[in-house]
Amino acid sequence: MADEQNLDNRAPEETPAAEGTSAGEDLAARVQALEEQLAAAQDQALRAAAELQNVRRRAEQDVEKAHKFALERFAQDLLGVVDSLERGIELSDPADESIRPMREGMELTLKMFHDVLRRYQLEQLDPHGEPFNPEHHQAMAMEESDSAEPGSVLKVFQKGYLLSGRLLRPAMVVVSKAPTPSNDEQA
Protein backbone atom coordinates (compact mmCIF):
# COMPACT_ATOMS: atom_id res chain seq x y z
CA MET A 1 0.00 0.00 0.00
CA ALA A 2 2.77 2.34 0.80
CA ASP A 3 4.13 1.62 -2.61
CA GLU A 4 0.77 2.37 -4.13
CA GLN A 5 0.62 5.67 -2.28
CA ASN A 6 4.09 6.52 -3.53
CA LEU A 7 2.97 5.71 -7.03
CA ASP A 8 -0.14 7.74 -6.53
CA ASN A 9 1.96 10.58 -5.20
CA ARG A 10 4.33 10.41 -8.15
CA ALA A 11 1.68 10.22 -10.77
CA PRO A 12 0.08 13.55 -9.89
CA GLU A 13 3.52 15.19 -9.79
CA GLU A 14 4.50 13.81 -13.19
CA THR A 15 1.24 14.79 -14.77
CA PRO A 16 1.63 18.55 -14.22
CA ALA A 17 5.23 18.32 -15.38
CA ALA A 18 4.12 16.53 -18.51
CA GLU A 19 1.40 19.11 -18.99
CA GLY A 20 4.00 21.88 -18.50
CA THR A 21 6.22 20.34 -21.12
CA SER A 22 3.25 19.93 -23.40
CA ALA A 23 2.20 23.55 -22.78
CA GLY A 24 5.80 24.67 -23.40
CA GLU A 25 5.88 22.75 -26.66
CA ASP A 26 2.51 24.23 -27.62
CA LEU A 27 3.81 27.69 -26.77
CA ALA A 28 7.03 27.12 -28.78
CA ALA A 29 4.99 25.85 -31.72
CA ARG A 30 2.71 28.87 -31.46
CA VAL A 31 5.73 31.23 -31.34
CA GLN A 32 7.23 29.43 -34.35
CA ALA A 33 3.97 29.76 -36.29
CA LEU A 34 3.69 33.46 -35.42
CA GLU A 35 7.32 34.06 -36.47
CA GLU A 36 6.61 32.37 -39.80
CA GLN A 37 3.49 34.51 -40.27
CA LEU A 38 5.52 37.63 -39.40
CA ALA A 39 8.25 36.68 -41.89
CA ALA A 40 5.61 36.07 -44.58
CA ALA A 41 3.92 39.42 -43.82
CA GLN A 42 7.29 41.23 -43.92
CA ASP A 43 8.10 39.55 -47.24
CA GLN A 44 4.70 40.59 -48.64
CA ALA A 45 5.22 44.17 -47.45
CA LEU A 46 8.69 44.25 -49.04
CA ARG A 47 7.32 42.88 -52.32
CA ALA A 48 4.45 45.39 -52.28
CA ALA A 49 6.89 48.27 -51.71
CA ALA A 50 9.10 47.03 -54.57
CA GLU A 51 6.09 46.68 -56.85
CA LEU A 52 4.94 50.20 -55.98
CA GLN A 53 8.41 51.54 -56.78
CA ASN A 54 8.36 49.68 -60.13
CA VAL A 55 4.92 51.09 -60.97
CA ARG A 56 6.14 54.63 -60.21
CA ARG A 57 9.26 54.16 -62.33
CA ARG A 58 7.21 52.77 -65.24
CA ALA A 59 4.77 55.67 -64.99
CA GLU A 60 7.66 58.18 -65.06
CA GLN A 61 9.14 56.43 -68.10
CA ASP A 62 5.75 56.44 -69.85
CA VAL A 63 5.36 60.17 -69.24
CA GLU A 64 8.90 60.81 -70.49
CA LYS A 65 8.25 58.73 -73.63
CA ALA A 66 4.98 60.55 -74.25
CA HIS A 67 6.80 63.90 -74.05
CA LYS A 68 9.54 62.66 -76.40
CA PHE A 69 7.08 61.31 -78.96
CA ALA A 70 4.99 64.48 -78.82
CA LEU A 71 8.17 66.51 -79.27
CA GLU A 72 9.24 64.24 -82.12
CA ARG A 73 6.04 64.81 -84.11
CA PHE A 74 6.15 68.54 -83.43
CA ALA A 75 9.83 68.74 -84.44
CA GLN A 76 9.17 66.86 -87.68
CA ASP A 77 6.47 69.38 -88.53
CA LEU A 78 8.86 72.28 -87.85
CA LEU A 79 11.63 70.86 -90.03
CA GLY A 80 9.70 71.77 -93.17
CA VAL A 81 9.64 75.41 -92.03
CA VAL A 82 13.39 75.35 -91.35
CA ASP A 83 14.02 73.77 -94.76
CA SER A 84 11.96 76.49 -96.47
CA LEU A 85 13.83 79.28 -94.69
CA GLU A 86 17.18 77.71 -95.63
CA ARG A 87 16.11 77.36 -99.28
CA GLY A 88 14.84 80.94 -99.37
CA ILE A 89 18.15 82.25 -98.04
CA GLU A 90 20.09 79.99 -100.40
CA LEU A 91 18.15 81.18 -103.45
CA SER A 92 18.17 84.88 -102.59
CA ASP A 93 20.98 86.99 -104.03
CA PRO A 94 23.08 88.55 -101.23
CA ALA A 95 24.18 91.30 -103.64
CA ASP A 96 20.59 92.43 -104.34
CA GLU A 97 20.08 95.49 -102.13
CA SER A 98 16.32 95.50 -102.63
CA ILE A 99 15.86 92.20 -100.77
CA ARG A 100 18.68 92.60 -98.25
CA PRO A 101 16.38 93.49 -95.30
CA MET A 102 14.15 90.52 -96.07
CA ARG A 103 17.18 88.20 -96.32
CA GLU A 104 18.55 89.49 -93.00
CA GLY A 105 15.14 88.92 -91.39
CA MET A 106 15.05 85.36 -92.73
CA GLU A 107 18.58 84.73 -91.44
CA LEU A 108 17.65 86.01 -87.97
CA THR A 109 14.47 83.91 -87.97
CA LEU A 110 16.46 80.84 -89.01
CA LYS A 111 19.03 81.49 -86.27
CA MET A 112 16.22 81.72 -83.70
CA PHE A 113 14.75 78.47 -85.02
CA HIS A 114 18.12 76.73 -84.68
CA ASP A 115 18.53 78.05 -81.12
CA VAL A 116 15.10 76.71 -80.15
CA LEU A 117 15.80 73.35 -81.79
CA ARG A 118 19.10 73.03 -79.88
CA ARG A 119 17.32 73.86 -76.63
CA TYR A 120 15.15 70.79 -77.19
CA GLN A 121 18.14 68.54 -78.09
CA LEU A 122 17.51 68.71 -81.84
CA GLU A 123 20.87 68.47 -83.59
CA GLN A 124 21.33 69.30 -87.27
CA LEU A 125 23.29 66.91 -89.50
CA ASP A 126 25.15 68.67 -92.32
CA PRO A 127 27.47 65.92 -93.54
CA HIS A 128 29.08 67.74 -96.50
CA GLY A 129 32.56 66.25 -97.02
CA GLU A 130 32.11 63.54 -94.37
CA PRO A 131 32.19 59.80 -95.10
CA PHE A 132 28.78 58.37 -95.99
CA ASN A 133 27.07 56.89 -92.91
CA PRO A 134 23.99 54.78 -93.75
CA GLU A 135 22.71 55.22 -90.19
CA HIS A 136 22.43 59.02 -90.61
CA HIS A 137 22.42 59.59 -94.39
CA GLN A 138 20.17 58.55 -97.25
CA ALA A 139 22.00 58.35 -100.58
CA MET A 140 19.93 59.93 -103.33
CA ALA A 141 22.57 59.52 -106.06
CA MET A 142 26.23 58.77 -106.70
CA GLU A 143 28.57 61.01 -108.68
CA GLU A 144 32.08 60.53 -109.92
CA SER A 145 34.57 62.90 -108.35
CA ASP A 146 38.31 63.43 -108.69
CA SER A 147 38.47 65.82 -105.76
CA ALA A 148 36.58 63.82 -103.10
CA GLU A 149 37.31 60.50 -101.48
CA PRO A 150 35.08 57.71 -102.80
CA GLY A 151 32.20 57.15 -100.39
CA SER A 152 32.15 60.70 -99.04
CA VAL A 153 29.25 63.13 -99.19
CA LEU A 154 29.51 65.55 -102.14
CA LYS A 155 26.21 67.40 -101.86
CA VAL A 156 23.47 67.69 -99.28
CA PHE A 157 19.94 68.01 -100.68
CA GLN A 158 18.31 68.11 -97.27
CA LYS A 159 19.96 68.25 -93.86
CA GLY A 160 19.23 65.52 -91.36
CA TYR A 161 18.34 65.86 -87.68
CA LEU A 162 18.88 63.94 -84.46
CA LEU A 163 16.51 64.27 -81.51
CA SER A 164 18.20 63.45 -78.21
CA GLY A 165 20.78 61.41 -80.11
CA ARG A 166 18.16 59.43 -82.05
CA LEU A 167 17.71 59.89 -85.79
CA LEU A 168 14.68 62.02 -86.53
CA ARG A 169 15.32 62.50 -90.25
CA PRO A 170 18.26 61.26 -92.35
CA ALA A 171 20.26 63.72 -94.44
CA MET A 172 19.51 63.35 -98.17
CA VAL A 173 22.91 63.26 -99.88
CA VAL A 174 24.87 62.64 -103.07
CA VAL A 175 27.79 60.27 -102.49
CA SER A 176 31.07 60.36 -104.41
CA LYS A 177 32.47 57.42 -106.29
CA ALA A 178 35.80 56.89 -107.99
CA PRO A 179 35.90 58.12 -111.59
CA THR A 180 35.74 55.43 -114.25
CA PRO A 181 38.89 55.28 -116.32
CA SER A 182 38.51 56.87 -119.76
CA ASN A 183 39.46 55.06 -122.98
CA ASP A 184 42.73 57.06 -123.18
CA GLU A 185 43.74 55.92 -119.67
CA GLN A 186 43.00 52.26 -120.43
CA ALA A 187 45.36 52.17 -123.47
Swiss-Prot record:
GO cellular component: cytosol
Primary location: cytoplasm
The protein's name in its UniProt record: Protein GrpE
Positions of region (Disordered): 1-25
InterPro entries: GrpE, GrpE_coiled_coil, GrpE_head
Role description: Participates actively in the response to hyperosmotic and heat shock by preventing the aggregation of stress-denatured proteins, in association with DnaK and GrpE. It is the nucleotide exchange factor for DnaK and may function as a thermosensor. Unfolded proteins bind initially to DnaJ; upon interaction with the DnaJ-bound protein, DnaK hydrolyzes its bound ATP, resulting in the formation of a stable complex. GrpE releases ADP from DnaK; ATP binding to DnaK triggers the release of the substrate protein, thus completing the reaction cycle.
Keyword ATP-binding (UniProt): no
CDD domains reported for this sequence: GrpE
Compartment(s) of residence: Cytoplasm
GO MF assignments: adenyl-nucleotide exchange factor activity; protein homodimerization activity; protein-folding chaperone binding; unfolded protein binding
A Pfam family it matches: GrpE
Subunit structure and binding partners: Homodimer.
GO biological process, one term: protein folding
Top-rank taxon, per record: Bacteria
Similarity comment text for this entry: Belongs to the GrpE family.
Keyword Chaperone (UniProt): yes
SS bonds (residue pairs): none
PANTHER family registered for this protein in UniProt: GRPE PROTEIN (PTHR21237), GRPE PROTEIN HOMOLOG, MITOCHONDRIAL (PTHR21237:SF23)
Keywords linked to the UniProt accession: Chaperone, Cytoplasm, Stress response
Gene name of the encoded protein: grpE
Transmembrane regions: none
